[in-house]
């Protein structure tokens, strides 16, 4: 979702087809709209301008408009295949006038200061190595009083990954730059965020991932193989098995983050 500009896409059309078969149309991370709703639980997005960082195939961006009443949502990603899919889906659902999808290279976010009331992200920030610069940019583009709400995959510590975690990351073959919840909190504090909350979701995804693996090995195998090929499915079954080990050990820590940019005068 957030990668280097000159690399081949990590989320190409095959990856999109595979992940949508597992997680639902427009969703390239687990939990579907229900987990998105949990990330923004208790927040009002009605009439707000929202940025979705690492928007992928656009399902979440569209959900924030259609279900949560955002006045306008902008999806940002560095990869062309997912942005093309997101734009097509917005047209199909009649939401093109309330959404914008932006493809741009990694680095400073391509938006003016104080552009958004809300910045959202779902399991994409792990692709960004420099957490301090990332959150400084998020803070910059938020309006005073604005909210940051996200879910992200993290590691339970800031030392070297265990052999099992190294094996899992190698199996994924993606540009992971995982950091601990404590490291994310520190980056948010340095950027200026206040009232920061960090909510662990390991227990939830540990169980969900086990169900996903069972589905891939069972009822989904033939259907998904017809769409992407059995070799691709077999590779991902191996990846899920490696991921389950680090979820069970607690080293893999899916986590929710939330913080506020102070209103002017505070």
Question: What are these model-derived regions, one by one?
Answer:
Residues 118-130:
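A short SAM/SAH-binding and catalytic strip from SAM-dependent methyltransferases
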Residues 132-147:
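A short glycine-rich, Lys/Arg-flanked "PGG" loop and its adjoining helix->strand segment in the class I
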Residues 177-191:
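Short alpha-helix
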Residues 154-175:
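Short, glycine-/aromatic-enriched active-site segment of Class I SAM-dependent methyltransferases
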Residues 107-118:
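A short acidic, Gly/Pro-enriched loop at the edge of an enzyme's catalytic core
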